[in-house]
UniProtKB/Swiss-Prot annotation:
Name of the protein: Complement component receptor 1-like protein
Glycosylation site residues: N98, N366
GO cellular component: basolateral plasma membrane; cell surface; external side of plasma membrane; receptor complex
Organism per entry: Mus musculus (Mouse)
Keyword Membrane tagged: yes
UniProt signal peptide: 1-40
Tissue: Ubiquitously expressed (at protein level).
Family the entry assigns: Belongs to the receptors of complement activation (RCA) family.
Disulfide bond positions: C85-C128, C115-C141, C146-C187, C173-C203, C208-C257, C237-C274, C280-C323, C309-C336, C342-C385, C371-C398
Key words of the record: Complement pathway, Developmental protein, Disulfide bond, Glycoprotein, Immunity, Innate immunity, Membrane, Phosphoprotein, Pregnancy, Receptor, Repeat, Signal, Sushi, Transmembrane, Transmembrane helix
UniProt superkingdom: Eukaryota
Transmembrane region(s): 406-426
């Protein structure tokens, strides 16, 4: 009996027992043959050079009538030979000490690694295990730490994930200060150690420009040169030698330095004005309105200013105000708000309702119209509300397609009817014209052939000629003879 296998894997004793049993081999020979396998199992499966031999898990296989074993061995499904590990993947924090181009390693092989710069210097190894995988290299290399950063003056440092190699920190300044320098730093390799790639920034006051001066007045503060975030200045109007007021201070008397972007300082508002007594500055701006009165820098007592709202807006309050003492306008200024000008029809059959249409629209607003399925839009799909309450262009209509088809059918029917009448009239006129021509020919024949002694004969001949469909030569000769 011959036992063969295309695989290089060792034969299992169970397979051999079945094979030799079927071949009629004596029991003594069979036991002698199986003895090496049994001893090998007792020795723990040690192979040559002290490497551990890897055995595949048992698989059910049968010897079929074709004298072949059913089922493929597990090693046939491996991308590498049994008892080996594939080359390990590249480690992110370490490199191999001895470089090799081997693509696989026997079980029990160990490889030496050393940690990369930026990590605490050390060596370690990974080993090919019995299951053809490598021991873990995780946490073998520990990242070095940069020195603990300190808060900048008038600022803060923000540590998010730590201060180890590769970490990033951020700096911010307190309110009223701006950052000079880099707002972040990264722990990087420097020579044989690690350190932050940039120095800590500086936080300085946000500066403001000198406050603007005003006619007939001045500002007062703790300094006249350096102004920074949070400082306050106060304005006053000039007085006479006795301290009597000559002007009225109009506006906010105090301004403070602030910032909109955290970089550049600005004053909180415009400076006040010092105006003559019993005068008024122009009234404040009224949104969506125009001032009809003459625009002047100053108004006298009891001067009147009138307002008018823009088209499409409705005024609330008095349309005119009067200048009063201490730069006050009375009554209260009016306001202009959008008025409901245009409305959609209550009956909107055939229109789509999901387009955000409203029942009422303000001046200048647009409405978009679309028809539902089965309807046709007649007119523009968009209309705008006008100041007089009308729509421009006029609102479109949604007409049912069945009605449109009926209208088209009626129109075509009318055209066909007119054409039929025209053809009928044409045929009648043509027929009358032909009859008129025949009568003329008959009259000419009578005049040519008229004779007193042959009236009866000629009349009979003409009647006979009309009733006949063809004219014979004999009849022509007879007519000539009579004439």
């Amino acid at each position: 009996m011959e036992v063969s296998s295309r695989s290089s894997e060792p034969l299992d004793p169970v397979w051999l027992l079945v094979a030799f049993g079927r071949g009629g081999v004596k029991l003594e020979v069979l036991l002698l043959f199986l003895l090496p396998f049994t001893l090998g199992e007792l020795r723990g499966g040690l192979g040559k050079h002290g490497h551990t031999v890897h055995r595949e898990p048992a698989v059910n296989r049968l010897c079929a009538d074709s004298k072949r074993w059913s089922g493929l061995p597990v090693s046939a499904q491996r991308p590498f030979p049994m008892g080996h590990c594939p080359a390990p993947s590249q480690l992110p924090s370490a490199k191999p000490i001895n470089l090799t181009d081997e693509s696989m390693f026997p079980i029990g092989t160990y490889l030496l690694y050393e940690c990369l710069p930026g990590y605490i210097k050390r060596q370690f190894s990974i080993t090919c295990k019995q299951d053809s995988t490598w021991t873990s290299a995780e946490d073998k290399c520990i990242r070095k730490q940069c020195k603990t950063p300190s808060d900048p003056e008038n600022g803060l440092v923000h540590v998010h994930t730590g201060i180890q190699f590769g970490s990033r920190i951020n700096y911010t300044c307190n309110q009223g200060y701006r950052l000079i320098g880099s707002s972040s730093a990264v722990c990087v390799i420097t020579d044989q150690s690690v350190d932050w790639d940039t120095e800590a920034p500086i936080c300085e006051w946000i500066p403001c420009e000198i406050p603007p001066g005003i006619p007939n007045g001045d500002f007062f503060s703790s300094t006249r040169e350096d102004f920074h975030y949070g400082m306050v200045v106060t304005y006053r109007c000039n007085t006479d030698a006795r301290g009597k007021a000559l002007f009225n201070l109009v506006g906010e008397p105090s301004l403070y330095c602030t910032s909109n972007d955290g970089e550049i300082g600005v004053w909180s508002g415009p400076p006040p004005q010092c105006i003559e007594l019993n005068k008024c500055t122009p009234p404040p701006y009224v949104e969506n309105a125009v001032m009809l009165s003459e625009n002047r820098s100053l108004f006298s007592l009891r001067d009147i200013v009138e307002f008018r709202c823009h088209p499409g807006f409705i005024m609330k309050g008095a349309s005119s105000v009067h200048c009063q003492s201490l730069n006050k306008w009375e009554p209260e200024l009016p306001s202009c708000f959008k008025g409901v000008i245009c409305r959609l029809p209550q009956e909107m059959s055939g229109f789509q309702k999901g387009l955000g249409m409203k029942k009422e629209y303000y001046y200048g607003e647009n409405v978009t119209l679309e028809c539902e399925d089965g309807y046709t839009l007649e007119g523009s799909s968009q209309s705008q509300c006008q100041s007089d309450g009308s729509w421009n262009p006029l609102l479109a209509k949604c007409v049912s397609r069945s009605i449109s088809g009926l209208i088209v059918g009626i129109f075509i029917g009318i055209i066909v009817f007119i054409l039929v009448i025209i053809v009928f009239i044409w045929m009648i006129l043509k027929y009358k014209k032909r009859n008129t021509t025949d009568e003329k020919y008959k009259e000419v024949g009578i005049h040519l052939n008229y004779k007193e002694d042959s009236c009866v004969r000629l009349q009979s001949l003409l009647t006979s000629q009309e009733n006949s469909s063809t004219t014979s030569p004999a009849r022509n000769s007879l007519t000539q003879e009579v004439s």
